[in-house]
Amino acid sequence: MTKAGSKGGNLRDKLDGNELDLSLSDLNEVPVKELAALPKATVLDLSCNKLSTLPSDFCGLTHLVKLDLSKNKLQQLPADFGRLVNLQHLDLLNNRLVTLPVSFAQLKNLKWLDLKDNPLDPVLAKVAGDCLDEKQCKQCANKVLQHMKAVQADQERERQRRLEVEREAEKKREAKQQAKEAKERELRKREKAEEKERRRKEYDAQKASKREQEKKPKKEANQAPKSKSGSRPRKPPPRKHTRSWAVLKVLLLLLLLCVAGGLVVCRVTGLHQQPLCTSVNTIYDNAVQGLRHHEILQWVLQTDSQQ
């Protein structure tokens, strides 16, 4: 790359008063460091070179009052171009500019501007006008500054709107996060209360079980003497042998019937002379005589009469 220092010698040699002419120097880049060392050079001519860009530190040359960048290949100006607040005269004729940086609105001292022969944005081209003479170039400077201030204001409003949207979104996120945290705190609080209630119930149940176990031996101890000192259960009175007596009576009745039948046969019929009947009659007479004095028979007869 060709620099002014190497092609044109020392810059101080080219300084004429406050004017520094570096035009037609076949420059591909601006010697910013060397220019910064010459604050006296308030008028700088860089026209008719091969500059396609300006470095960002070029905007630090705030001592510049008049700047000629015409007939180069500039496609854009640095974003901080507005730092050149002392600039009054700016020639950008015949470059490749489409737009200007928003900071251009900060060039409050700009009185003269030429933007002819640039592929400007249609809106900016209409604002800049033709700039065919001194008057039109002054009007161009004023109108372009007003336009860039409006663009800057629009961008600032848009920036503020985006910031507001971001703030609202942040507030919503914070509110959502706070609601989530509050919900989590409430959930933890409820779980803690439920756990405490569960433990309390377990504690009460353990105490109740312990009291019940302590009461049990006392109850058994109180019931033990009662079982010893209490009267024995009374045995049910012996049941009367009604059925046995009935069977006995039936047997006796059958026996009596048999005996009576035999007696009748032996006493009434003509068989009483038979040896068997004689024996039967004798036994009968003896039995009747003995039974009349027998205590068992008397007891049976008495029992029967009582029933």
UniProtKB/Swiss-Prot annotation:
LRR repeats lie at residues 10-31, 40-62, 63-84, 86-107, 109-128. Residues 229-241 have a biased composition (Basic residues). It is found in: Microsome membrane; Endoplasmic reticulum membrane; Nucleus envelope. Residues 150-241 are annotated as: Disordered. Required for nuclear import of FGF1, but not that of FGF2. Might regulate nuclear import of exogenous FGF1 by facilitating interaction with the nuclear import machinery and by transporting cytosolic FGF1 to, and possibly through, the nuclear pores. Gene3D superfamilies: Ribonuclease Inhibitor (3.80.10.10). The keyword Transcription does not apply. The modification N6-succinyllysine is found at residue 73. The modification N-acetylthreonine is found at residue 2. Residues 148-216 form a coiled coil. The gene is Lrrc59. The modification N-acetylmethionine is found at residue 1. The modification N6-acetyllysine is found at residue 135. Can form homodimers. Interacts with SGO1. Interacts with FGF1. Residues 2-244 are cytoplasmic. The keyword Acetylation applies. The chain crosses the membrane at residues 245-265. It comes from the Eukaryota. Signal peptide: none annotated. The modification Phosphoserine is found at residues 23, 25. Keywords: Acetylation, Coiled coil, Endoplasmic reticulum, Leucine-rich repeat, Membrane, Microsome, Nucleus, Phosphoprotein, Repeat, Signal-anchor, Transmembrane, Transmembrane helix. This is Leucine-rich repeat-containing protein 59. InterPro entries: Leu-rich_rpt (IPR001611), Leu-rich_rpt_typical-subtyp (IPR003591), LRR_dom_sf (IPR032675), LRR_domain-containing (IPR050216). GO terms for cellular component: endoplasmic reticulum membrane; mitochondrial nucleoid; nuclear envelope. Residues 266-307 are lumenal.
